[in-house]
Amino acid sequence: MSILEENEDPLIWSNNIIKALKDLSDIEFQKLTWSGEHPKFISSFTETLAILYDDLDFERYIEYYKSINGMNRIYELFNEINLMINDFKDIGYETEMEIDGYKKILENKDWLLITEKTKDIIHEY
């Protein structure tokens, strides 16, 4: 059974994953978009994760990447960031519902670690 779905372009999928990871790694972009202060874009913690996991199926992409490239350094980083996000997401969803919750997420040491670790993927990919 192929990991790729019918008519799915792996290059487009990969490019979209990297774009989503760049957004995940950019704390300044998050500050602007999550607060509604960006002149063109608006987003949220939930939307940031929804793009990566719901729209782009990040966990399936990790398996696809492994099937093509093996268990190399990038694969290990993908897995590590996936585990970190899975450990944090429930806290993030709850915090986001609070008044100024997005600010609390952006100041959370675990979220800051996730954004920094994601930069490692961007630099090595």
Show where each model-derived region lies.
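A structural signal for well-ordered alpha-helices, especially hydrophobic packing surfaces
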Residues: L21, S25-E28, N82-I85, K89-G92, ...
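Internal, hydrophobic cores of structured domains that mediate oligomerization or house catalytic pockets
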Residues: I114-T115, K119-E124
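Amphipathic protein-protein interaction modules
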Residues: D57-E116
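Short terminal alpha-helical segments
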Residues: M1-D57
